[in-house]
Amino acid sequence: MPGQKPVVLFLTNSEFGQSSVVLAVAQELVRQSACEVHVASFSALKQQVEALNVAFHALPGRSMKEALCDSGLPFLPKHAPGTRGAVESYRKGLQHVVAPWEPAGYEPIYRACLDLLDKLNPDLVAVDPLFGPGQDACNVRQCRYLVLSPASFKDHLVQVQPHLRVLWKYPVISSGLPCPLPLFLIIINFYLIFKLVLHTFLSKRVQTLTKWRNHIGIPGDLTTIYANFNEKVPWLLPSIPQSDFPLKIPTNVTGCGPIIPPFESVAHNPTASWLAQRPTILFNLGSHMKYKLTDAQQVVTALSMVLHTYPDMQILWKCELSHDDPSSKEPESSDSSAIQDLIPAELTDRIRVTSWITPSPMSILAHDSTIMYVHHGGSNSFHEALAAGVAQVVCPVWLDTYDVAARVEFLRVGLRGNGKAAPHLEGSELGAAICRTAHRLRSGDMGTRTRELQAHILAQEEGVSGTGPADVYGVGRRKAAKVILDMITA
């Protein structure tokens, strides 16, 4: 109808690691008021979507996280790097990531996506690459769609690199191998790729779901398998060429820069005055990390080493105790006191412990006092740190987080914090990694690199309308929104 706004529909998993880029781009589209925005996901995402004044459509069935729990997995199982750990991750973890639902759980979600496409008749659909029912529905209905991913170039493009570089140049997921691969590790990479194909792509779970899909009229293999990169649809990613390993980027892929939702400034938060006192390290291993007291003690050992070496620094530590820990008899209400008892008295004013970071981790990273981010290697954390221009210490625990650890070292913007102890932490090893990173910041070379990458992110802004040229945190979402608007108005 004349004057009616075009409709953009986002189909996504509800887990924040996947949906954060959807929330960011949806909010930017709403800000520009150029289209009608809808988001379809599971009920866990409803409150966040509706807070953006965006129409939310609840999907039936189990979310990805719930489906993994139904399979007996604690979301994603931790594993060690190296040959044995990687093979174990393919056997127990990765096949469930690409096929979290069995046919009985997949079908109602897929049917609901079909119904929603028929009802809304969107001008464009943006799909989460790990949300298979959504991509299948778009392909069956022959909708115009693109893929919006929080992951890196390497995650999606390694298998389409020329000259079989997937085999001999880039470390396979879960391996913890460096990039570029030294000659003596190439044979191990070969072996792990074979095991990945065997235990993931050719697993009974994946093959059963694939055959069922084909039987009900869905063509091809699972769209969630990274090896099935679709060169016929546009892709939007938070990577830029300077923030990843050297790769050949197909013309249907747009690197936007970090795709970060708008966030509240820390200026009016009680934390602001504490942050302003000293250079600050943010230590946040993610919401999945629940510490046993023995793990917390290792962190305290590391932080004590750092603060005795650098008496002008302080650390904000997100720490929540696991109440499944048999070694801890502390009730939940005494988490804070149990952790505080581990911290040396002379350091209590320089280690602030919190069970939840307010206003948000991004708010802390954006503060002028923050100089370093210690995190688990999630793609969102990595890209947030790049945008903030801070150094990184990565403590990987599973799958692609080992790639992120290799990536920060390759880019010279950080170090790995648990090279020997992964997927766990060992105090002296972690403390030494943080100290080395701090030294390189103070000596200038790492600080120069983080600022260079931040400048490359800002350079993506050309031709994109925004709030100002210095708003590095909005570059990615604005560029992604521009691609979407260009597509629906072409």
UniProtKB/Swiss-Prot annotation:
Pathway: Mycotoxin biosynthesis. Its main location: membrane. The chain crosses the membrane at residues 181-201. It is found in: Membrane. Glycans are attached at residue 252. It comes from the Eukaryota. It is a single-pass membrane protein. Keywords: Antibiotic biosynthesis, Glycoprotein, Glycosyltransferase, Membrane, Transferase, Transmembrane, Transmembrane helix. GO terms for molecular function: UDP-glycosyltransferase activity. GO terms for biological process: antibiotic biosynthetic process. InterPro entries: UDP-glycosyltransferase, UDP_glucos_trans. Its EC number is 2.4.1.-. One of its GO terms (cellular component) is membrane. The keyword Membrane applies. Signal peptide: none annotated. Glycosyltransferase; part of the gene cluster that mediates the biosynthesis of burnettramic acids, an unusual class of bolaamphiphilic pyrrolizidinediones that display potent antibacterial, antifungal, and cytotoxic activities. The first step of the biosynthesis of burnettramic acids is the hydroxylation of proline by the proline hydroxylase buaE to generate 4-hydroxyproline. The PKS-NRPS buaA and trans-enoyl reductase buaC construct the highly reduced polyketide chain, and the condensation (C) domain of buaA then catalyzes the amide bond formation with the activated 4-hydroxyproline. Belongs to the UDP-glycosyltransferase family. This is Glycosyltransferase buaB. It comes from Petromyces alliaceus (Aspergillus alliaceus).
